[in-house]
């Protein structure tokens, strides 16, 4: 597919996403609200995106106002939806849950529109991250040339429906994204960045080429069978633990935006018990089990690329 067809399809899918999000807003707004609880987190200011987070103060909102905030959040996809002092590199987060009473017909209608919405989100992410063929540092320019001010992470995030949950409780998760990669994978990625011939701030084009060339040399010097890992820290994330009494099952969900709980009262479903998200303090985090990690040597800091050392 040529570039212009790709851009046209991206714009078309985004327009469809806006329509389905509006339809979802209308559908949910018409349903009887039985409970709503959302947790507002501090905004991340420009220039502070990469600072380690040690404390997060949580503000709770309940009832109709929580529902209003939650429904608005699903449609906050652009930079102009937030203050000028807020970082464009950090996605907005509003953990929580909105609980609605539904008939069988209403449940099917809502599930259909959520499924369609999530399919469009996944297709947009695939167009931008895979089909464009662009390395990550060039996607920003590609997206903002055609959808100016789009917050891609907010756009990609899927909407999570819950059917007759017994309880929804909240907490925090600290983790790393760890991925095994090959020497060839990394060289291909670096060469794609080099051949693109563009500058990536704060570097000039020449400085950027020099940096990438040095990284390529470092990787090429490794033996072919070297075990490589990308170990990228993920900032602390809100999560939800959902309990289903009948199935005796707990499901954990990432919770960057409100979950949508549908309660079928005519089938005897009760209002789920809702927990609270407490303030985060890194000093109070306790690990149930932390296995010994294999020793690693940092090779390419920009990519969080490590060489696994033999014990």
Swiss-Prot record:
Coiled coil: none annotated. Keywords: Cytoplasm, DNA replication, DNA-binding. One of its GO terms (biological process) is DNA replication termination. Its main location: cytoplasm. It comes from the Bacteria. SUPFAM superfamilies: Replication terminator protein (Tus). Transmembrane segments: none annotated. It is found in: Cytoplasm. One of its GO terms (cellular component) is cytoplasm. Gene3D superfamilies: 3.30.54.10, Replication terminator Tus, domain 1 superfamily/Replication terminator Tus. GO terms for molecular function: DNA binding. It holds the Pfam family Ter. Belongs to the Tus family. Trans-acting protein required for termination of DNA replication. Binds to DNA replication terminator sequences (terA to terF) to prevent the passage of replication forks. The termination efficiency will be affected by the affinity of this protein for the terminator sequence. This is DNA replication terminus site-binding protein. It comes from Yersinia pestis. The gene is tus.
């Amino acid at each position: 597919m040529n570039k212009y067809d790709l851009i046209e399809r991206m714009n078309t899918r985004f327009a469809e996403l806006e329509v389905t999000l509006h339809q979802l807003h209308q559908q949910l707004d018409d349903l009887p609200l039985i409970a709503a609880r959302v947790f507002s987190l501090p905004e991340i200011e420009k220039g502070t995106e990469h600072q380690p987070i040690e404390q997060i103060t949580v503000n709770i909102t309940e009832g109709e106002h929580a529902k209003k905030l939650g429904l608005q959040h699903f449609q906050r996809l652009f930079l102009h939806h937030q203050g000028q002092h807020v970082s464009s590199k950090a996605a907005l987060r509003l953990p929580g849950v909105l609980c609605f009473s539904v008939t069988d017909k209403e449940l099917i209608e809502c599930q259909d529109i959520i499924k369609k919405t999530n399919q469009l989100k996944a297709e947009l992410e695939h167009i931008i991250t895979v089909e464009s063929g662009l390395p990550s540092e060039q996607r920003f320019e590609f997206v903002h040339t055609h959808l100016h001010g789009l917050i891609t992470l907010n756009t990609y995030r899927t909407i999570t429906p819950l059917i007759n949950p017994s309880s929804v409780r909240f907490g925090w998760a600290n983790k790393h994204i760890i991925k095994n990669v090959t020497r060839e994978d990394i060289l291909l990625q670096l060469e794609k960045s080099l051949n693109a011939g563009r500058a990536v701030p704060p570097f000039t084009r020449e400085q950027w080429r020099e940096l990438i060339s040095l990284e390529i040399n470092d990787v090429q010097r490794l033996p072919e069978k070297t075990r490589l890992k990308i170990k990228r820290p993920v900032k602390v994330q809100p999560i939800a633990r959902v309990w289903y009494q009948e199935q005796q099952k707990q499901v954990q969900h990432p919770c960057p935006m409100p979950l949508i709980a549908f309660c079928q009262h005519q089938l005897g479903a009760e209002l789920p018990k809702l927990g609270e998200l407490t303030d985060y303090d890194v000093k109070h985090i306790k690990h149930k089990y932390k296995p010994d990690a294999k020793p690693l040597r940092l090779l390419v800091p920009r990519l969080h690329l490590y060489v696994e050392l033999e014990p």
